[in-house]
Amino acid sequence: MCENQPKTKADGTAQIEVIPCKICGDKSSGIHYGVITCEGCKGFFRRSQQNNASYSCPRQRNCLIDRTNRNRCQHCRLQKCLALGMSRDAVKFGRMSKKQRDSLYAEVQKHQQRLQEQRQQQSGEAEALARVYSSSISNGLSNLNTETGGTYANGHVIDLPKSEGYYSIDSGQPSPDQSGLDMTGIKQIKQEPIYDLTSVPNLFTYSSFNNGQLAPGITMSEIDRIAQNIIKSHLETCQYTMEELHQLAWQTHTYEEIKAYQSKSREALWQQCAIQITHAIQYVVEFAKRITGFMELCQNDQILLLKSGCLEVVLVRMCRAFNPLNNTVLFEGKYGGMQMFKALGSDDLVNEAFDFAKNLCSLQLTEEEIALFSSAVLISPDRAWLIEPRKVQKLQEKIYFALQHVIQKNHLDDETLAKLIAKIPTITAVCNLHGEKLQVFKQSHPDIVNTLFPPLYKELFNPDCAAVCK
C-alpha cells in the first residue's frame, strides 16, 4: 500500500513517520493511498472504498477530525481523506517524481526541527520546575510517618492495602524529583464542562447504608457533593464516552494490521505504547485537577499522588475500553488482542494487564463506580513522601463512603466494594511490573528512552530522568 519512500541527500531513507497523519494528526506509518496517514485512517479509507460506503453527518458537515474524535463522524472523516488527496488509484502511480521527493524531504526536515525545538523547550521547563519544587520537597520528609488507619464500609473499618509505588523508596532516600508535573501547566483536555449533575438531588440512596452510620464530622450532603463532583469530572475527562466505545466495540484490527504491529521493532512498539500511555495520563491529570478535594491538597501532595497513582488510574480506566467477550482492548482507534503487543517482549506484563481488565469487567461497574474507584485509587494516603497524609486519608474515606452508597444502590451483592479493594494489590503489582520492564528496556535502549519517549512518561516512570532532563 505504501509508495516508495523518498531518499534523503545524506543518510538513506527519510523518516516519513516523523510527519503526523494528515487526516487526524496521529503518528503516521507512511504514505497510504497517496497521503501520509496513520494505520487507522489508512484502514478506514480502505474499508470505505471496498464497501462503497455512504456516510451521513449528524451535525453540519464540518466536524473536527483529530486523533481523539476521528471515529465520531465517518462522513467528515472520509471527506477530509478525499480533500487531502487519498485515492484508490494512488497505489498505481509507481515511483515518486524528483519534485515530490524533494518536497517530502523538506517537510520531513521541518518536522524534525520542530520536534527538536519541542524537546529543548520541554527540557527547559522541567529544569525550571525542578528549581521551584526542590526546596519544598527536600526538607522535612525523611521522618514522615505515613501510617494511616482504614476506611468504613457497612459500618465496619476496612484496612486498605498499602501501595508500594513505583520507586521502592526507603526512608533514607531523598524525595523523588517532581519536575515533570506542573499542576498549572497541563493542557486542558476539555475547556468547557459538558455534564451538569448539580440539578440531580440526592444522587445516592443513603437509606441502604447500614444504620446510616458515618465517620464523625462527615455529613451526607458532603458525601453527595464530593461524589457528584468526582463523577462529573470523570465523565468530562474520559477519552471516549461509553456510547462511542459501544459503537467501536466490534471494530477490530485486521489480520494485516495485527501482523504490522507484530513486525514492528521492539523499540518502535515501546515508543508507540509510551505515547498512548502518556496521552491517557494527561486525561487522568485533568481528571484529578477537577476534583475539588484534590485541588485543596498542598501542591507537593498533588504531584506525588499523580506520579505514584496515575498509571493505576489508567489501568482502572482500561476496563471501559476492554471487550471481555473477545479479550480485546481499544488501541489506536480499534480493538485488538494480546498478540498485537508481541513485539514488546513483555508477554507477562501484557497478560497481567489483560487479566486485570477482564476481572474488573466481570464486576460490571457503572460509570459512577469507575469514577469513584479511580479517585480512591489515586488519592491514597499510603504514598511515600506525602506532607499531609492524614488530609489525604480523610478525603479517601469520603470517596469510599460515596462508592459504598453507589454500590449498594446498583448491586445486590454487598461484597462488591470488598472485591474492588482486594484488587488494589493487583493494580499496584501490574504497575510495578511495567516499571521493571521499562528499566530492562532502558538498559538495552537508553538513547531511545532518553530522546524519543514523551518527557512526561520519562518523568513519571524513569527514576533517573532528572539527570536526563537537566
From Swiss-Prot:
Keyword Transferase found: no
Molecular function via GO: DNA-binding transcription activator activity, RNA polymerase II-specific; DNA-binding transcription factor activity; DNA-binding transcription factor activity, RNA polymerase II-specific; nuclear receptor activity; RNA polymerase II cis-regulatory region sequence-specific DNA binding; sequence-specific DNA binding; zinc ion binding
DNA-binding region: 18-93
Xref: Pfam families: Hormone_recep, zf-C4
SUPFAM superfamilies: Glucocorticoid receptor-like (DNA-binding domain) (SSF57716), Nuclear receptor ligand-binding domain (SSF48508)
Cellular component, GO annotation: nucleoplasm; nucleus
Keywords in alphabetical order: Activator, Biological rhythms, Developmental protein, DNA-binding, Metal-binding, Nucleus, Receptor, Sensory transduction, Transcription, Transcription regulation, Vision, Zinc, Zinc-finger
ZnF endpoints (NR C4-type): 21-41, 57-81
Disordered: annotated span: 104-127
Record field: compositional bias (Basic and acidic residues): 104-117
Localization: Nucleus; Nucleus, Nucleoplasm
Motif placement: AF-2: 456-461
InterPro entries: NHR-like_dom_sf, NR_DBD_ROR, Nucl_hrmn_rcpt_lig-bd, Nuclear_hrmn_rcpt, ROR_rcpt, Znf_hrmn_rcpt, Znf_NHR/GATA
Phenotypic consequence of gene deletion: Mice are blind, show juvenile ataxia, duck gait, hind paw clasping reflex as well as delayed onset of male fertility. They suffer a degeneration of the retina during postnatal development with severe defects in photoreceptor cell morphology. Mice display reduced anxiety and learned helplessness-related behaviors. They also show a significant increase of the circadian period. Knockouts for isoform 1 display duck gait and lack amacrine and horizontal cells with an excess of ganglion cells in the retina.
All copies of domain NR LBD, residue ranges: 222-460
Tissue note: Expressed in inner and outer neuroblastic layer as well as in the ganglion cell layer of the developing retina. Expressed in bone marrow osteoprogenitor cells.
Induction remark: Induced by aging in bone marrow.
PANTHER family, per database record: NUCLEAR HORMONE RECEPTOR HR3-RELATED, NUCLEAR RECEPTOR ROR-BETA
Domain notes per entry: AF-2 (activation function-2) motif is required for recruiting coregulators containing the LXXLL motif, such as NCOA1, and control the transactivational activity.
Subunit structure, as described in the record: Monomer. Interacts with CRX.
Family according to the record: Belongs to the nuclear hormone receptor family. NR1 subfamily.
Functional note: Nuclear receptor that binds DNA as a monomer to ROR response elements (RORE) containing a single core motif half-site 5'-AGGTCA-3' preceded by a short A-T-rich sequence. Considered to have intrinsic transcriptional activity, have some natural ligands such as all-trans retinoic acid (ATRA) and other retinoids which act as inverse agonists repressing the transcriptional activity. Required for normal postnatal development of rod and cone photoreceptor cells. Modulates rod photoreceptors differentiation at least by inducing the transcription factor NRL-mediated pathway. Isoform 1 is critical for hindlimb motor control and for the differentiation of amacrine and horizontal cells in the retina. Regulates the expression of PTF1A synergistically with FOXN4.
Stated name of the protein: Nuclear receptor ROR-beta
